[in-house]
A protein has these predicted regions:
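Interfacial aromatic-anchored transmembrane helix boundaries in multi-pass membrane proteins
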Residues: 28-34, 73-101
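Membrane-embedded alpha-helical hairpins and interfacial helices in multi-pass inner-membrane proteins
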Residues: 38, 113-185
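Alpha-helical transmembrane segments of integral membrane proteins
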Residues: 7-16, 41, 45, 64-69, ...
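Short helix-perturbing small/polar motifs within transmembrane alpha-helices
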Residues: 22, 90-128, 177
Length: 190
């Protein structure tokens, strides 16, 4: 087996990235309209996308596929208006996820869960503007949804909550990975 990415690897990567993103958006879009849910949005994304990601891992046998998925996910998030901070974080946490998966020979269940949890931290990129560019974020939210919505978002996103957002994404990614693994096992035994 060649270590280089082939056309079939890139096709799988593209299909699973789209599946991962669409499933995540199905959760994120309705929840994102309710400001009080924004702090847990990344965690819920990581929970529900654990299913397609674990399915994706059945196809990943080559280094770099998770990194590329992270970059593409960040790019797609940027194109939907959530800022492009997900791209560099997708590259960093995708690479770390790839390294973890490779250290387990792409077969270790524990490394798959840890790799997914680390990979999922790319989602923190969508929160960076809310924490570090507060005035610009408020103006963007106000222009799109009104000043009242913008005020409510900023009220539920104090700077200290970034620690909870990061921890929530990581922990819920573990649960999402377990959910994905359980679904895969149930499909195998049908």
């Amino acid at each position: 087996m060649s270590n280089k990415l082939q056309a079939k690897d890139l096709i799988s990567l593209g299909l699973f990235t789209v599946l991962y993103f669409v499933i995540g958006c199905c959760v994120a879009i309705p929840i994102g309209f309710v400001p009080i849910f924004l702090p847990v949005l990344g965690a819920l994304w990581a929970l529900i996308t654990g299913i397609p990601f674990m399915l994706f891992l059945t196809r990943v046998k080559k280094f770099g596929m998770v990194t590329i998925m992270g970059i593409l996910s960040g790019l797609l998030m940027g194109l939907t208006g959530m800022g492009f901070w997900g791209v560099p974080l997708g590259a960093v946490f995708g690479l770390l996820g790839d390294l973890i998966l490779k250290s387990g020979g792409y077969k270790s269940a524990k490394k798959s869960l840890l790799g997914y949890a680390v990979f999922s931290l790319w989602m923190v990129g969508t929160y960076i503007p809310m924490y570090f560019m507060v005035e610009d974020s408020w103006a963007s939210f106000a222009a799109s949804f009104g000043a009242e919505y913008a005020d409510q978002v900023m009220a539920v996103m104090p700077m200290w909550s970034i620690i909870l957002v990061i921890a929530g994404i990581f922990v819920f990614a573990i649960f999402g990975g377990l959910l994905g693994k359980a679904l895969l096992l149930s499909l195998i035994h049908i």
